[in-house]
From Swiss-Prot:
It comes from Escherichia coli (strain K12). The lineage of its organism: Bacteria, Pseudomonadati, Pseudomonadota, Gammaproteobacteria, Enterobacterales. This is Molybdenum cofactor biosynthesis protein B. May be involved in the biosynthesis of molybdopterin. Can bind GTP and has low GTPase activity. Can bind MPT, but has no MPT adenylyl transferase activity. InterPro entries: MoaB, MoaB/Mog-like_dom_sf, MoaB/Mog_dom, MoaB_proteobac, MoCF_biosynth_CS. GO terms for biological process: Mo-molybdopterin cofactor biosynthetic process; protein hexamerization. Homohexamer. Dimer of trimers. SUPFAM superfamilies: Molybdenum cofactor biosynthesis proteins (SSF53218). Induction: By anaerobiosis, repressed by the molybdenum cofactor. GTP binds at S110.
Length: 170
């Protein structure tokens, strides 16, 4: 088990929206993640939108992994079953370790909301160069489910018995 802090420690977060249709003005899921992270006390240090292309996704995420400024990457979109949904294929080669439990718990929670449609979600998470990366579906409702029930509690250094803080770059 990890050591747990008695005070809130903000993390440095980058947000990536994967979409061929969304622009900054109508990026509702990206805006939700940004606003929620900031309201929780975290620092959103960058935000970007890339097309549904595994190499564009990988390039942007790789830059953040290499940066000392980013500890956590939140990705919305690109996790479904269509040909354009390539986030898992872009990310899995980058992971030093996959966090299998994220996808499992996300689909369990989603099942309560959308039933068997959750089978089409390929939400993934992993750690690369001490950067924690979460990829979730593009709907704002799915982002809310992931943020409120999984990500936010695990980014809080006060969460017991363990949280992700000991695994992040300083």
């Amino acid at each position: 088990m990890s050591q747990v802090s008695t005070e809130f420690i903000p993390t440095r977060i980058a947000i990536l929206t994967v979409s061929n249709r969304r622009g900054e003005e109508d990026d509702t899921s990206g805006h939700y993640l940004r606003d929620s992270a900031q309201e929780a006390g975290h620092h959103v240090v960058d935000k970007a939108i890339v097309k549904e292309n595994r190499y564009a996704i990988r390039a942007q995420v790789s830059a953040w992994i290499a940066s000392d400024d980013v500890q956590v990457v939140l990705i919305t979109g690109g996790t479904g079953l269509t040909e354009g949904d390539q986030a898992p294929e872009a990310l899995l080669p980058l992971f030093d370790r996959e966090v299998e439990g994220f996808g499992e718990v996300f689909r369990m929670l989603s099942f309560e909301e959308i039933g068997t449609s959750t089978l089409q979600s390929r939400a993934v998470a992993g750690v690369a160069n001490k950067t924690l990366i979460f990829a979730m579906p593009g709907s704002t409702k799915a982002c809310r489910t992931a943020w409120e029930n999984i990500i936010a509690p695990q980014l809080d250094a006060r969460t017991r018995p363990c949280n992700f803080h000991p695994h992040l770059k300083k």
